[in-house]
Amino acid sequence: MCGIVGYVGMRSAQQVLLDGLEKLEYRGYDSAGVALTQRDGIRVVKSKGRLSTLRSKLEELALPQSSCGIGHTRWATHGEPSDVNSHPHSTPRVSIVHNGIIENYGALKERLIAKGYTFASETDTEVLVKLIDSCYQGEPLQALQAALAKVRGSYALAVLFKDCLLYTSDAADDLIGV
């Protein structure tokens, strides 16, 4: 189980994400993280442990204000609780947070390794973000659709590109606020 939050707007994305994650922390307290759009790309900050650890890390970093981002609290399923297994998982052009289980992540990972991708974590989410990256040809939505066509499993995920935030789920019980 995990908590996922995404935000696009005029307020500080970092603060909105942290406030949202605080309300969802009961859904996962093994780790927490955020990905925020910045002028030069996407900045990911994550940590093992409760949300308070992430808050402290973000206070120390004093990042420039962002108006778009995604956040995640994690209850570990694939991979032990650690900084490297924490979400968001990223490539230079895309970052994702994910709740669910990708059943065929092992086979997908082998194909991605054959294409030259490397992996640092033990998570199915890192496989998913690199799969989306491998499908990217300039159009974020098409990359996401192409990647999900290869996936077996359950998912709710927020996908952040520098200029685009997408959300998708295979379930009907999501809560989305506007």
What do the PLM-derived regions correspond to, one by one?
Residues 167-170, 174-178:
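Single conserved hydrophobic/aromatic residue that forms the stacking wall/gate
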Residues 1-169:
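Conserved short alpha-helical segments that host acidic/polar catalytic motifs at enzyme active sites
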